[in-house]
């Protein structure tokens, strides 16, 4: 494989791969805003348009624009969120697969993102990697963060792009080869973070929004006293608490998808800064030397 990463390090560039508009705001947005403020170029690739999303904000139920054109509404929301975060943004152009429900589960809709052959689904992302030339790619884990079919496919295309964009024999016609240096999985739903916030809230005499989630994790643990061990441990924590309000504003920009009185806003930004001022990641592969644990996704590159 040909590698260009050592040929050009400045400016540093990061690419985050997400399934739907709004995912970038709920997973890693404070980290991205922090890096943007320090001069890093940050790009978000959104695999689908979120056309099959439901309205999650009670205040917008029955909104005629969203009901008539959910895809159009979410494009406007994504543009607003990108502006708030200061990031660059690229749609990859696939159709939302929706979240199947029922027993048995219904078939996914024809031609949706999750049913695309991998080489077709990954090609636009490989093209973007070769054009944007990121040093770091941030992706979901094998479970997609949670098992939505589009999240699982977003994981697959991100890993495929990381492994093939530097090979000029792969994906011909998508631009000159570029080999990213590091691949991370996002750990937005880190049980350690939820536990720390939960107990801090209890100690302060405040209601915790994490009680049910923690109870569910405890039920799945064979020992019954600690959360299940993650397949991908935290290797890297980014101190970005100063950007939690920016994160929250980006979330609110996705008005159809986010309840402003809901789970994401149940704990104040100052409390989160005090207890857990980081966003958490797991280093999956590095083509540059680095030492764990890290406090910088670009460790080994500067």
What are these model-derived regions, one by one?
Residues 1-15, 102-106, 110-302:
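Metal-dependent de-N-acetylase/amidase catalytic core
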């Amino acid at each position: 494989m040909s590698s260009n990463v050592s040929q050009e390090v400045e400016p540093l560039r990061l690419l985050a791969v997400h399934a739907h508009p709004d995912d970038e705001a709920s997973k890693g947005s404070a980290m991205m805003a922090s890096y943007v403020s320090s001069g890093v170029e940050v790009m978000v690739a959104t695999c689908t348009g979120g056309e099959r999303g439901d309205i999650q904000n009670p205040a917008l139920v029955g909104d005629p624009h969203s009901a008539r054109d959910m895809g159009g509404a979410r494009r406007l929301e994504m543009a607003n969120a990108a502006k708030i975060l200061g990031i660059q943004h690229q749609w990859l152009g696939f159709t939302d697969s929706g979240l199947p429900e029922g027993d048995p589960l219904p078939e996914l809709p024809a031609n949706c993102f999750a049913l695309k052959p991998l080489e077709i689904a990954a090609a636009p992302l490989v093209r973007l990697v070769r054009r944007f030339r990121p040093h770091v790619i941030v992706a979901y884990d094998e479970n997609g963060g949670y098992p939505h079919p589009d999240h699982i496919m977003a994981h697959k295309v991100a890993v495929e792009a990381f492994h093939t964009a530097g090979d000029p024999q792969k994906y011909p016609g998508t631009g000159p080869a570029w080999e990213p240096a590091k691949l991370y999985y996002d750990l937005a739903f880190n049980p350690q973070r939820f536990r720390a916030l939960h107990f801090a809230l209890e100690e302060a005499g405040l209601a915790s929004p994490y009680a049910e989630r923690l109870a569910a994790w405890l039920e799945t643990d064979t020992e019954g006293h600690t959360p299940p061990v993650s397949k991908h441990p935290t290797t890297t924590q980014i101190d970005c608490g100063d950007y939690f309000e920016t994160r929250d504003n980006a979330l609110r920009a996705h008005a159809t998808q986010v309840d402003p009185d809901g789970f994401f806003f149940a704990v104040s930004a100052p409390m989160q800064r005090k207890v857990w001022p980081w966003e958490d990641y797991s280093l999956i592969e590095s083509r540059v030397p680095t030492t764990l644990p890290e406090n910088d996704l670009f460790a080994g590159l500067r």
